[in-house]
Curated annotation (Swiss-Prot):
Induction or repression: Expressed in methanol-grown cells.
Superkingdom, taxonomy of origin: Archaea
Function: Part of the F420 non-reducing hydrogenase II complex that catalyzes the reduction of methanophenazine to dihydromethanophenazine.
Annotated compartments: Cell membrane
Gene (UniProt): vhtA
Residue positions binding Fe cation: C64, C572
Lipid bilayer topology: Peripheral membrane protein
GO molecular function, one term: ferredoxin hydrogenase activity
Lineage: Archaea, Methanobacteriati, Methanobacteriota, Stenosarchaea group, Methanomicrobia
Subunit structure and binding partners: Composed of a large subunit (VhtA), a small subunit (VhtG) and a cytochrome subunit (VhtC).
Annotated GO biological process: methanogenesis
Similarity-based family: Belongs to the [NiFe]/[NiFeSe] hydrogenase large subunit family.
Protein name: F420 non-reducing hydrogenase II large subunit
Cofactor: Ni(2+); Fe cation
Length: 591
């Protein structure tokens, strides 16, 4: 047995360590997911004015500040009793904020955080011996996804075309948010009861111009098939079978045109989505399309025991009407709330079934498995107790272990697409399950993220040009007495998954307790009080460290793929702790 540890896993967004035990066949037999720093925002918010939560919590993460700001605002809407009265145009503008932020985040993940692993030399060793076709596929992967300052065998590799093109698009999307939200990151226009800046006709016109420029990137790099044709035949398909058939027929046409010339370029019709859809999966690429090889990403990152996992979505994006239900019942939002079991059975979502365990975390809470509204954040203060190498029976992470009805929950694009029964992703999940694969794996997670990006690009156009009406009502007044001895819950969908904020106030209307359960905690969580591993840990156990080729303990590309397929954001999950006593408590400095 060989210990293989990846530390850090994350390219940005905090510090995450994965420690695994691997057998002689390269199969992972045990795993621990450790978040290496402590998040103290819940303690910072105590005794603050509740309205500050919408601004302070945005500092939890610079990638998805809007998600935290919107979730906090949702909690404040309920705290002040105005959720049912928030004007339609305010809700539509919140949709635009979040949609732009999610597209920007997904593009960053696909091209900058996950994509570079497709240029890993492990794939060169597997593909180039397959002759001209294999070499052409490898050259295409390297030419699209190689990161900046990349070397292989001592030679400098030019940065990939898709990688480089995505970076200015991220900037453009940030500028779009700043135009209507005040600034990005850390927008200043969120407020309970609505939002603060009435976007003008000129703003909407400029936003539309930006949108067309972003869609130019999509057509040049991401999807080479006509965008509306893709949406009509996948997102709007009448059944999962029809969506999958459309994609496989489209890929078959591309293969028939490309195999004789070995041209898998964008100019030959291979957008990044088409390329990964064909070559990323053993089932799709090799068994359905007859390709000589694939990356076999559908063979790693799955769940061995479906009874120990579920797929949780809180629901996101308001319907264009006045008011909303803060508890997010099924059907209340465009992306509905829900729970899908590991066997793909659909269940009703109940926020009262959410708890957090600290049995394997660095906390000295008085009670385990607390609901978030009663949650505690009492960290270890003895540095001798903070050890990451004690194994699965020890306490080994700063992350808590959220559970839904006692079960570990995967959150994020795959969970959202399954819960809304999106035809393409649902069809792929069903096909994989029918053929003996886990319906959740690296391949389906990444395709779900790509598909969600396309769906949001489609929905954004409608929100910007149809649903939002300049000059409409954007806020309602607050009764500050309503926030005394009160509670609020904000349930929302961040790019990486279900995000919840819970707030309680005292008789003076100040924050008495504040708790966040973030996607990174759901996904990267350690074991719970029953010893059940978190989603990432479960997906590692039973998977190979190298999905293709020989076992290579020094280049465990499978671990990279599995960990990064969840788009881990440890900045949200954890922050920092001072064990020296040099920093005065309750001192907050905003730079």
């Amino acid at each position: 047995m060989v210990n293989v540890t990846v530390d850090p896993l994350t390219r940005i967004e905090g510090h995450q360590r994965i420690s695994t035990e691997v057998d002689a066949n390269g199969v992972i037999t045990d795993a621990q997911s450790s978040s290496l720093i402590f998040r103290g925002f819940e303690r910072i918010l105590q005794h603050q004015d509740p309205r500050d939560a919408a601004f302070l919590t945005q500092r939890i993460c610079g990638v998805c500040p809007l998600s935290h700001g919107l979730t906090a605002t949702n909690a404040l809407d309920e705290l002040y009793g105005v959720a049912e009265h928030v004007p339609k145009d305010a809700l539509v503008m919140r949709n635009i904020f979040q949609g732009l932020n999610m597209v920007a985040s997904h593009a960053t993940h696909i091209y900058v955080l996950f994509g570079p692993d497709l240029a890993n030399p492990a794939y060169k060793k597997v593909l180039t011996p397959l002759g001209d076709t294999g070499s052409a596929v490898w050259d295409e992967m390297l030419g699209r996804f190689a990161p900046i300052s990349y070397k292989m065998d001592g030679a400098a590799i030019p940065a990939g075309s898709s990688y480089m093109a995505a970076i200015p698009e991220k900037k453009r999307l940030q500028e779009m948010i700043a135009l209507i939200a005040g600034r990005m990151p850390g927008p200043s226009s969120l407020y309970p009861g609505g939002y603060t800046y009435p976007a003008t006709v000129a703003d909407i016109t400029k936003l539309s111009t930006y949108y067309l420029q972003v869609m130019d990137f999509v057509s040049a790099h991401t999807l080479k098939v006509d965008f509306n044709t893709w949406i009509e035949n996948t997102y709007k398909a009448s059944s999962p079978t029809k969506a999958v058939n459309f994609v496989t027929e489209h890929l078959t046409d591309l293969i028939n045109k490309s195999t004789s010339s070995n041209d898998f370029s964008k100019e030959a019709g291979w957008g990044d989505v088409e390329f990964y859809a064909a070559f990323g999966s053993e089932l799709v690429g090799e068994k359905l399309l007859g390709l000589p090889a694939s990356l076999k990403h559908d063979t790693i990152g799955g769940y061995q025991d479906p009874s120990k996992i579920c797929f949780v979505a809180y629901g996101g994006y308001y319907k264009p009407t006045d008011g909303y239900d803060p508890r997010s019942p099924a059907g209340d939002r465009i992306f509905t709330s829900g729970v899908v079991s590991g066997n793909l059975e659909y269940l009703k979502f109940d926020p009262d079934k959410i708890t957090e365990s600290t049995a394997h975390s660095f906390y000295q809470n008085s009670v385990n498995d607390l609901p978030p509204v009663k949650g505690e954040t009492v960290p270890f203060t003895d540095p001798e107790k903070i050890v990451y190498t004690g194994g699965s029976d020890s306490q080994y992470s700063w992350d808590k272990a959220p559970r839904y009805d006692g079960i570990a929950g995967e959150v994020g694009p795959l969970a959202r697409m399954l819960n809304i029964k999106e035809p393409l992703v649902t069809g792929l999940a069903l096909a994989l399950a029918e053929n003996g694969y886990s319906p959740a794996n690296v391949y389906t997670r990444m395709l779900a993220r790509m598909q969600e990006t396309a769906i949001l690009a489609y929905e954004l156009l409608n929100w910007v040009t149809v649903d939002y009406e300049p000059g409409g009502k954007i806020s309602v007044p607050l009764d500050f007495n309503a926030a005394k001895d009160s509670q609020g819950m904000g349930l929302w969908e961040a790019p990486r998954g279900a995000l919840g904020h819970w707030i309680s106030t005292n008789g003076s209307g100040k924050v008495a307790n504040y708790q966040c359960i973030v996607p990174g905690s759901w996904l990267m969580s350690p074991r719970d009080s029953n010893g059940i591993p978190g989603p990432l840990e479960q997906s590692l156990i039973g998977s190979k460290i190298n999905p293709v080729g020989e076992v290579d303990y020094t280049n465990p590309v499978g671990i990279f793929h599995m960990g990064r397929s969840y788009d881990p954001c440890i900045s949200c999950a954890v922050h920092t702790i001072d064990l020296t006593g040099k920093c005065a408590p309750n001192t907050l400095r905003i730079l």
